[in-house]
Structures are given as structure tokens and as C-alpha cells.
Amino acid sequence: MRISLTKTAKPSKKAILWGIAYLIFYQFLFSYVLGFLENFLPEPLDIIEVNLIFSLTNVTAVVLIFRKYLLQTLREARYRIPAILGYALLAVLGTMYLSELVSNLVWQLNPDYYNVNDVGIDLMLLENRPMVILMTVILAPITEELLFRGLIFRSLFDRSKVLAYVVSMCLFSFIHLTNYIGYLDIQWLGLAFLEYLPAAYCLAFAYHNSGSILSPMLVHALVNMISIGLF
């Protein structure tokens, strides 16, 4: 059964402001702060350690910022289990189908294209599989769904459903590319942007229709499990 999102839990204005501030810090400043602090360590951190610190700090900060919203979501969830699970399943299937269509289009536009993020994750999997699973299947879905669906999508939805979809989808896709701006050409970045849109749409769809942020969290976790070969 479809749930009206306007009648469900919503982050407070204070949480929204803190969330926006942290989103900016998380994306544009955190890596520099971490790099500065690393100078005081006796040995440099390896890539797994850096990403784990990044992931744990992000999930802790975001959960603290949105703790009241999360608690209200959990209280509402017991009445929405069928919707949470049902729309999560639809969104996973939709993500796989739409991603395949977009990937085929991308490869037709550039047969040499490959997703740089996926390559990085594959390399980390070879180094420390359990830690990568923790980061991609548990930590990333919580952090990213609270920020992009809970913060961006939900705060815009009451004003405009279309705006909520467009802004959350574009930001979600853009955020996954920022580390490569200046290193990859504009065509490559554009193709990568397109690749993230199906998932961004389906995650917003799951939240919109289930009325619970738990649904896109579940979708995100399952899609990441599939992408790293756990299914």
C-alpha cells in the first residue's frame, strides 16, 4: 500500500540546517581535514583505513544530526512493513533494469568507458573484503539515504515533488563524481553522471511510496550487495 509521504516523519528545521552544513563538509572539506590529521601519525593510513574512518565518522555524525527523525521513522515503521519491503523490492528490480539500459547507452556512446568508483571498490575488495562490505552495505546506505533522501528529498517534497526528485537525483549523481573533477574529461564525467541516475530515481521512488527512509536504505544495501558480488 502506498503511504503519503507528507504525513510521515520529517527532519526538523534545525536538523535540516545541520544536515546541509555537514553535507558540504562531508563532500568538500573532510578529505582535507583527514589528510591534515594524517600528518601527525607515525605511518600513513592505507586506503582501507582512510575510507573506514571516513565512513564511520560520516555515519556517526549523520545519525546524531537526524536522531529524532530516525526515532520517529522507527516508531512509524511497524505500521509500514509491507510497504517498506514491497517498494524496496520494486526499487531494486527497477534499479537493475534501468541501470542496464543506461549502461548499454553509455557503452554505445563510449565503448572504452568504465566506472572509476567501481574499479576502486573492486581493488579494495581484494585487499580487505569484510571492511569493504561493512562500508558499502551498512555504513554508506545509512549515511547517503539520510542525506540525499531524508534531508534533500524530504525537505523539498512538501513544496514540489518534481523538484524533490530532480534535485536529489542530480546531487546524488554529482556527489559520486566530485573526486574526479579535474582528473577526468567532461564526457567521461557526464557518462558517469548518467550511470547514477537510475539508482537515484529508484531510491527516491522507494522513499516516496513507502513513506519510510528505511525502504531506500534497504534498497541501497541490496544494490550494493549485488554490485560487489554477494548475490
Tell me the role of every PLM-derived stretch.
Residues 2-25, 47, 69-100, 158-163:
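Interfacial transmembrane-helix boundary/kink motif in multi-pass membrane proteins
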Residues 39-45, 71-140:
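Juxtamembrane helix-loop-helix connectors linking adjacent transmembrane helices
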Residues 63-73, 206-209:
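Structural signal for the C-terminal ends of transmembrane alpha-helices
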Residues 61-62, 103, 107, 231:
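Alpha-helical transmembrane segments and their lipid-water interface positions
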Residues 18-69, 115-123, 131:
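Alpha-helical transmembrane segments in multi-pass membrane proteins
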Residues 100, 127-231:
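Transmembrane helix-loop-helix hairpins at the membrane interface
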Residues 22, 26, 50-54, 87, ...:
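Alpha-helical transmembrane segments of multi-pass integral membrane proteins
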Residues 22, 26-30, 34, 54-62, ...:
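Alpha-helical transmembrane segments of multipass membrane proteins
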